[in-house]
């Protein structure tokens, strides 16, 4: 087994004390064990740091970084990817859930299919109260939140993803060299553009195809009250101008990038 593992699991965290231990326990219980976990704490004000430090002391596959200043979410996502030295990489949201064979199934597919740059499991949405009760918000029909993008033609791949218009595939397992090429967080770490995850996927489609594995599952937590994108942008301290013109910024970037 490679000391650094085959895949880096990047977990950017901020005030996740209620769920982070359970999330890491779920990851370390995966059927596939050849990994490194990198946790980057963006100056949490709760007990996230204390919990993560304790966990990392008990498992040498877990590397923990604490930052004395909150550098913002984009910066934190970029930080964990920048530290990756393995063949594969995946971003993890602290409150989402994988099926037990998520890593095993998706890595196996990428190992056997060189023309694919990323792979994710079929996806459903849920809401979890922190008493550990889980409520399925909506049963996901096939390819509702993620879809295979497997055309050999780059332009057709881009068009397919633009028509699909969902950002969940940002949480795919990627080939590290390809996601570092595509990483919008590195290109513009403090740029107030809401669609950074969407832009990253569009860029990586230049390099290859995206797969959806129907035998593994990615369960994405969403708010039961369905906060709007605008409210979430306000929470992240986007300015009114950035919120108003976020779509314009994306369009400008897209036409510059793809012509």
Features from the language model and the residues they span:
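C-terminal, non-catalytic tails of nucleotide-sugar-dependent glycosyltransferases
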Residues: 151-152, 173, 239-259
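Nucleotide-sugar donor-binding/catalytic module of glycosyltransferases
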Residues: 1-233
């Amino acid at each position: 087994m490679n000391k650094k593992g085959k895949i880096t699991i990047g977990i950017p965290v901020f005030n996740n004390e209620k769920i982070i231990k359970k999330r890491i326990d779920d990851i370390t219980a995966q059927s596939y064990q050849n990994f490194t976990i990198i946790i980057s704490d963006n100056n949490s004000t709760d007990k996230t740091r204390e919990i993560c430090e304790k966990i990392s002391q008990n498992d040498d596959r877990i590397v923990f970084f604490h930052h004395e200043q909150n550098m913002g979410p984009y910066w934190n996502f970029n930080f964990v990817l920048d530290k990756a030295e393995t063949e594969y990489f995946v971003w993890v949201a602290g409150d989402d859930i994988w099926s037990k064979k998520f890593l095993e199934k998706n890595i196996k597919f990428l190992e056997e299919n060189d023309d694919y740059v990323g792979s994710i499991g079929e996806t459903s949405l849920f809401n979890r109260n922190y008493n550990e009760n889980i409520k399925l918000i909506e049963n996901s029909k096939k390819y509702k939140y993620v879809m295979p993008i497997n055309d050999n033609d780059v332009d057709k791949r881009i068009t397919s993803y633009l028509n699909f218009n969902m950002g969940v595939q940002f949480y795919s397992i990627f080939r590290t060299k390809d996601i570092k090429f595509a990483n919008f967080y590195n290109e513009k770490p403090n740029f107030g553009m809401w669609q950074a995850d969407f832009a990253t996927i569009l860029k990586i489609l230049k390099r290859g195809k995206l797969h959806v594995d129907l035998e593994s599952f990615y369960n994405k937590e969403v708010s039961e009250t369905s906060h709007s994108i605008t409210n979430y942008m306000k929470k992240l301290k986007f300015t009114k101008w950035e919120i108003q013109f976020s779509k314009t910024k994306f369009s400008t970037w897209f036409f510059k990038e793809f012509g």
